[in-house]
């Protein structure tokens, strides 16, 4: 049921009796390219009010999860990519200059937001080391006084596109962004203003916008796309719920055609190299009392589904089976006492061969970044070769990936990934197979750069897990996903998660049923909570 009454929502918001979760439901749309994806779709987005939750809607394509925001008193509508691998929100200015990204440099790979750092590593680590503990943030009132004097410049924290063609076999690589040469970089228009097709923000028409007295915002991604603009803060509305004075950047020049809503750790904000962090969306939701903890749970749903969700401040027990097991995030740099990326240890990767035998293809415990900004997954060369061998794949120079038997798309075999030594997630091999042509299938796992200190799991692996990201305590909790439309949402208190069990079960056919729910005591608030459900339409692009 769609909520049409703003007055009713206002009354509910005023009557908040406890911290409420903030939920983003995402709708999935698919097409041959981004151009054949109309805002209209045969599936109707759901806007539903629930006690104790605030819903935002996401949509999945190749895999882009796009949220619709309304910014400022003029409520300019912007659709932005939702990304766990980066931490900053930036949108397009209404009068920005669209430029083409350089496409001559093709010796770097696009891994998804939050990866592929090109900035001088030693300098960056020293600047981050000089930060106070993460509790030291620049508060909104300090921003209003413009006390921070920084130059927000960051090179290489990821890429909007994760499409990679390995043209020289394992050990060598080159990149290909789907829009380079035609629309520029990661969707840039090569000079026309089609890069505002997903919305823009006119600061002059907003009575509530305040510009920071700082140097320019500037970010560049590994595929050479970039954005330059200003920093400011304004009210941002998601469905009918408004987050007051949210900090974000407004690009006045970019080679990308869509902005980004980064919800990662504050240590990955572009301002960290200048000595401070600020409250991005998860932190601001907590600071404003909308949620009790900077925590969100991720449910991507099946590869062909039309909906999934990110739930802030709460857990949906219907969306997983068994127990949620908590794993500490890994420190990104030894010189820094806290994590910068959402990176967790993977201790084992078991692959079942066609003969039924199981092989561990991981030589030792390895750090893995969990990144919704990446469609595919990336592992080190030896791991990739072992995976390809176990699946009887053949590396193809012409295709630029491992070619596998298309029968694997219907296989019931799994890749079993052990996180932190105590939680195994079963990933269907069928989810890792991509249909390259009518008769050719490739493996959707690529080689990670040998210069990287971590591997990366994108959506084709993450959708098999129900994942809870705790940004306050630097923890990730995982359970095997249960695909279902049912819900059993509970708010998480300030003390965090204790042992919780899911109410969902998955049958051999992949459908879901519901059993009685066993929830832990402690920090899980089981009493009714009056809150808002924020539904936000997010379009996801599958480019083939």
Swiss-Prot record:
UniProt binding sites for pepstatin A: 83-85, 371-375
Domain Peptidase A1: start-end pairs: 65-479
GO CC terms of this entry: cell surface; extracellular region; extracellular vesicle; fungal-type cell wall; membrane; plasma membrane; side of membrane
Signal peptide range in chain numbering: 1-17
Region (Disordered) location: 31-50, 500-519
PTM (free text): The GPI-anchor is attached to the protein in the endoplasmic reticulum and serves to target the protein to the cell surface. There, the glucosamine-inositol phospholipid moiety is cleaved off and the GPI-modified mannoprotein is covalently attached via its lipidless GPI glycan remnant to the 1,6-beta-glucan of the outer cell wall layer.
Active site annotation, chain numbering: 83, 371
Subcellular localization, as worded in the UniProt entry: Cell membrane; Secreted, Cell wall
EC number(s) from the headed UniProt entry: 3.4.23.24
Gene Ontology annotations of biological process type: adhesion of symbiont to host; fungal-type cell wall organization; proteolysis; symbiont-mediated perturbation of host T-cell mediated immune response
SUPFAM superfamilies: Acid proteases (SSF50630)
Residue stretch(es) of the prosequence: 521-544
Glycosylated residues in this chain: 212, 240, 252, 422, 499
Comment on pH dependence: Optimum pH is 5.5 using casein-resorufin as substrate, and 6.0-7.0, the pH of the saliva, for cleavage of Hst 5.
UniProt keywords, alphabetically: Aspartyl protease, Cell membrane, Cell wall, Cleavage on pair of basic residues, Disulfide bond, Glycoprotein, GPI-anchor, Hydrolase, Lipoprotein, Membrane, Protease, Repeat, Secreted, Signal, Transmembrane, Transmembrane helix, Virulence, Zymogen
Induction trigger: Induced by fluconazole. Expression is regulated by growth phase, temperature, and white-opaque switch.
UniProt topology in membrane: Lipid-anchor; GPI-anchor
Disulphide linkage map: 98-195, 406-441
Residue ranges of the TM segments: 524-544
GO molecular function (one): aspartic-type endopeptidase activity
Lipid modification (GPI-anchor amidated serine), residues: 520
InterPro entries assigned: Aspartic_peptidase_A1, Aspartic_peptidase_AS, PEPTIDASE_A1, Peptidase_aspartic_dom_sf, SAP-like
Family: Belongs to the peptidase A1 family.
Function in brief: Secreted aspartic peptidases (SAPs) are a group of ten acidic hydrolases considered as key virulence factors. These enzymes supply the fungus with nutrient amino acids as well as are able to degrade the selected host's proteins involved in the immune defense. Moreover, acts toward human hemoglobin though limited proteolysis to generate a variety of antimicrobial hemocidins, enabling to compete with the other microorganisms of the same physiological niche using the microbicidal peptides generated from the host protein. Plays a key role in defense against host by cleaving histatin-5 (Hst 5), a peptide from human saliva that carries out fungicidal activity. The cleavage rate decreases in an order of SAP2 > SAP9 > SAP3 > SAP7 > SAP4 > SAP1 > SAP8. The first cleavage occurs between residues 'Lys-17' and 'His-18' of Hst 5, giving DSHAKRHHGYKRKFHEK and HHSHRGY peptides. Simultaneously, the DSHAKRHHGYKRK peptide is also formed. Further fragmentation by SAP9 results in FHEK product.
Subunit-structure text: Monomer.
Record protein name field: Secreted aspartic protease 9
Gene responsible for this protein: SAP9
């Amino acid at each position: 049921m769609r909520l049409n009454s703003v007055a009713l929502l206002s009354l509910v918001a005023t009557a908040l009796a406890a911290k409420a979760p903030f939920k983003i439901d995402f709708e999935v749309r698919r097409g041959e390219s981004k151009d054949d994806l109309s805002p209209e779709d045969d599936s109707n987005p759901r806007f539903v009010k629930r006690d104790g939750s605030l819903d935002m809607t996401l949509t999945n394509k190749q895999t882009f999860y796009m949220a619709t925001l309304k910014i400022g008193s003029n409520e300019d509508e912007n659709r932005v990519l939702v990304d766990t691998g980066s931490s900053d929100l930036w949108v397009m200015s209404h009068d920005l200059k669209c430029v083409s990204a350089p496409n001559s440099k093709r010796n770097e790979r696009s891994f998804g937001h939050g990866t592929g750092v090109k900035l001088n590593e030693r300098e960056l680590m020293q600047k981050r080391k000089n930060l106070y503990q993460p509790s030291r943030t620049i508060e909104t009132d300090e921003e209003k006084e413009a006390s921070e004097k920084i130059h927000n410049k960051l090179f290489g924290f990821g890429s909007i596109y994760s499409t990679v063609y390995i043209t020289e076999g394992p050990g060598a690589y080159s990149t290909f962004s789907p829009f380079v040469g035609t629309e520029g970089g990661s969707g840039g228009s090569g000079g026309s203003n089609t890069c505002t097709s997903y919305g823009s923000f006119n600061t002059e028409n907003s009575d509530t916008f305040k510009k920071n007295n700082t140097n320019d915002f500037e970010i560049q991604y590994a595929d050479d796309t970039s954005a330059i603009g200003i920093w400011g803060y304004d009210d941002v509305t998601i469905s009918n719920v408004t987050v007051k004075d949210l900090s974000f950047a407004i690009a006045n020049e970019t080679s990308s055609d869509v902005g980004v809503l980064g919800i990662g750790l504050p240590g990955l904000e572009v301002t960290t190299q200048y000595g401070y962090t600020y409250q991005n969306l998860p932190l601001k939701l907590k600071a404003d009392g909308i949620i009790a903890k900077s925590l969100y749970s991720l449910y991507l749903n099946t590869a062909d589904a039309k909906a999934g969700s990110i739930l802030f401040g709460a857990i949906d027990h219907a969306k997983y089976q068994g127990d949620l097991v908590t794993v500490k995030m890994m420190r990104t740099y030894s010189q820094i006492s806290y994590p910068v990326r959402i990176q967790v240890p993977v201790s084992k990767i078991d692959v079942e061969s066609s003969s039924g035998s199981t092989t561990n293809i991981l030589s030792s415990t390895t750090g893995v970044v969990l990144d919704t900004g990446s469609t595919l997954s990336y592992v080190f060369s030896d791991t990739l070769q072992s995976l390809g061998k176990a699946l009887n794949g053949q590396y193809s120079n012409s295709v630029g990936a491992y070619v596998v038997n298309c029968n694997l798309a219907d296989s019931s075999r799994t890749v079993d990934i052990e996180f932190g030594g105590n939680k195994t997630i079963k990933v269907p091999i069928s989810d890792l197979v991509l249909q390259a042509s009518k008769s050719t299938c490739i493996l959707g796992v690529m080689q990670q750069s040998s210069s990287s200190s971590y591997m990366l799991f994108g959506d084709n692996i993450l959708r098999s897990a129900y994942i809870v990201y705790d940004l306050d305590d630097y923890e990730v909790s995982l359970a095997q996903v249960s695909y279902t439309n049912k819900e059993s949402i509970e708010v998480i208190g300030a003390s965090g998660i204790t042992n919780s069990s899911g109410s969902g079960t998955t049958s051999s056919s992949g459908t879901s049923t519901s059993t009685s729910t066993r929830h832990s005591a402690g920090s899980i608030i089981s009493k009714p909570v009056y809150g808002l459900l924020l539904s936000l339409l997010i379009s996801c692009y599958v480019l083939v």
